[in-house]
Amino acid sequence: MQLQLNAAEISELIRKRIEGFEADTEARTEGTVVSLTDGIVRIHGLADVMFGEMIEFPGNTYGLAMNLERDSVGAVILGPYQHISEGDRAKCTGRILEVPVGEALLGRVVDALGIPIDGGGPIEAQATSPIEKVAPGVITRQSVSQPVQTGLKSIDSMVPVGRGQRELIIGDRQTGKTAVAIDAIINQKGTGIKCIYVAIGQKASSVAGVVRKLEEHGALEHTIVVAASASESAALQFIAPYAGCAMGEYFRDRGEDALIIYDDLTKQAWAYRQVSLLLRRPPGREAFPGDVFYLHSRLLERSARVNAEHVEKLTEGKVKGKTGSLTALPIIETQAGDVSAFIPTNVISITDGQIFLETDLFNAGIRPAINAGLSVSRVGGAAQTKIIKKLGGGVRLDLAQYRELAAFAQFASDLDEATRKQLERGQRVTELMKQLQYSPMSVGQMAVSLFAANEGFLDDVEVDKIQDFESALQGYMRSSHGELLDKITKTGDYSDEIAAELRAAIENFKTTNTW
């Protein structure tokens, strides 16, 4: 039997096949892994890669393109890389690194990529944001005029921090730098300020301790913890602050206020140095790469107070008439008090002031161990509440005169009455500035203590009784003059009427002798 080939039938069949053919083509540049050393991968053949682009490796692993050379690309791998080997394919993604942002992250602990590590389930984020963003321009910024109360007498009275400011916390190891930052976070409870705590290169146990303390004091619900612990790769430690900053910018650009702590930027600089040296970039001073200043300046310049037009534009008109701010408290660890080292001088020059913590003061039991002479706030004075500004000036002056006279008094045997009084006043004010950890004070409580010091109510109290006197006075004010404290905390105003009320209350308390 002979088969008859029907040309019409065959052409119809071919036509249907052609019509049903779906050509889903995806143009992606692919390259080959040439070498892999210490988390740094060299790739050949990625012609169209951008700087900072995400590169996809087998096993759902990603890297960050950092060196674009003539015939190869140097990238850092974000995460474990044991399963990657020479000859593997690497693909361009056409995307830059983004992290989840939004309210859903509050109360959670995430890694540098925004992935939850607290066992609390996945995060349903409202949006994602690139970790690298251009800082707000000069025109979109607004001057710092509202305070961020840390709850610490010595900071709020002498080195005040404003919303949108960058205030450096600098000191040797074990001087209470993290304690100051954690107290500041705890004090934001109920103020509406969202907090981001970025832990860089710390022990996982230390981060767990911080999270536990925040939880105990009810401060975790308004805080995001971004942790890149010491066990994680240098690449993740290097990008963690940028990820935290992107999360803070979400609130800033919606007309809200946020506070970010970088703990600490010394370790970020070390991680960046490690990555740069492995990428064979030329080393400079202290073996840091040439752009280590830019590493910190582009991060800290993103902390700012932005005007209402900027917020309105970014929210597409949903939020009107509200300014937003991102306040930064970067931490730098010094070696043997050397603030003239490379990284400390860099960050001091970028920030709007510094809180200098000293080992000698810490060991002498003066905690927080703030050196009032070296600590300064360049823009915070404009943001201080009226009452703290009025009362804090006297305290700063007392301490400055005390430091000067104390050095002189070591050599002088007979001191005149005025000098002796000044020394005694200084000792009492120094004692008054001591504060227990995790016990931040309200503006009203602070005003009472500062008023007592300024008006000479402490002059007849023994130096070793000052702390007892203060806690008894605060207890008395809370129970008998709670309304006055609330009024001062709410308004922050200072008038002759308030001064008279405070004077009468403290005089009345002193007659009881209950301390």
UniProtKB/Swiss-Prot annotation:
Signal sequence region = none
**Keywords for this entry?**
ATP synthesis, ATP-binding, Cell inner membrane, Cell membrane, CF(1), Hydrogen ion transport, Ion transport, Membrane, Nucleotide-binding, Translocase, Transport
Q: How does this protein sit in the membrane?
A: Peripheral membrane protein
- Which cellular component, as a GO term, is one annotated location? plasma membrane
Which residues take part in binding ATP? G171, D172, R173, Q174, T175, G176, K177, T178
Residues at site: Required for activity? Answer: S375
Keyword check for Transport: yes
Instruction: State if Cell inner membrane is listed as a keyword.
Output: yes
**Could you tell me which InterPro entries the record lists for this protein?**
ATP_synth_asu-like_sf, ATP_synth_asu_C, ATP_synth_asu_C_sf, ATP_synth_F1_a_nt-bd_dom, ATP_synth_F1_asu, ATPase_a/bsu_AS, ATPase_F1/V1/A1_a/bsu_N, ATPase_F1/V1/A1_a/bsu_N_sf
Enzyme kind, highest EC tier: translocase
GO molecular function annotations of the record: ADP binding; ATP binding; proton-transporting ATP synthase activity, rotational mechanism
Which reaction does this enzyme catalyse, per its entry?
ATP + H2O + 4 H(+)(in) = ADP + phosphate + 5 H(+)(out)
Please state which protein family the record places this protein in: Belongs to the ATPase alpha/beta chains family.
List, alphabetically, the HAMAP family matched. Answer: ATP_synth_alpha_bact (MF_01346)
Q: Which PANTHER family does this one have?
A: ATP SYNTHASE SUBUNIT ALPHA, MITOCHONDRIAL
Q: What name does the UniProt record give this protein? A: ATP synthase subunit alpha
Organism expressing this protein natively: Nitrosococcus oceani (strain ATCC 19707 / BCRC 17464 / JCM 30415 / NCIMB 11848 / C-107)
